[in-house]
Amino acid sequence: MNDRITLAQAHCQPREKKEHKLGQARLAELLTQVPGWELSNNGHALTRTFQFDNYYRTLAFVNALAFIAHCEDHHPDMNVHYGRAVVCFSTHKIGGISEIDFICAAKTSALYEQGI
């Protein structure tokens, strides 16, 4: 990825080969660019919980995120609750985390910061 483009500005490219799975050093580097996200599932996923005032705002966020996921062709696992949504990205075909998970995490954080 071009260093002049932020993760939130980048677009997903298919990552289906095992060599696209990120190593520990690159994971640690990219984690600094997505505050609030953490490794989960024994380091095989990237997860963040988003808080909302009510169920309507939670679902509005989830629906907006669904549109972003569709456009990027990379879809998170989500748990939706009253006042919160747990979003989890991983690249299933490689059995871990790739750069596209960080791109989508950054886009998700940007959506949340917009107050959707």
Swiss-Prot record:
CDD domains: PCD_DCoH_subfamily_a. GO terms for biological process: tetrahydrobiopterin biosynthetic process. Keywords: Lyase. InterPro entries: PCD_sf, Pterin_deHydtase. SUPFAM superfamilies: PCD-like. One of its GO terms (molecular function) is 4-alpha-hydroxytetrahydrobiopterin dehydratase activity. Its EC number is 4.2.1.96. It comes from the Bacteria. It is an enzyme of class 4 (lyase). It catalyses: (4aS,6R)-4a-hydroxy-L-erythro-5,6,7,8-tetrahydrobiopterin = (6R)-L-erythro-6,7-dihydrobiopterin + H2O. Gene3D superfamilies: Transcriptional coactivator/pterin dehydratase. Disulfide bonds: none annotated. Belongs to the pterin-4-alpha-carbinolamine dehydratase family. This is Putative pterin-4-alpha-carbinolamine dehydratase. It comes from Xylella fastidiosa (strain Temecula1 / ATCC 700964). The lineage of its organism: Bacteria, Pseudomonadati, Pseudomonadota, Gammaproteobacteria, Lysobacterales.
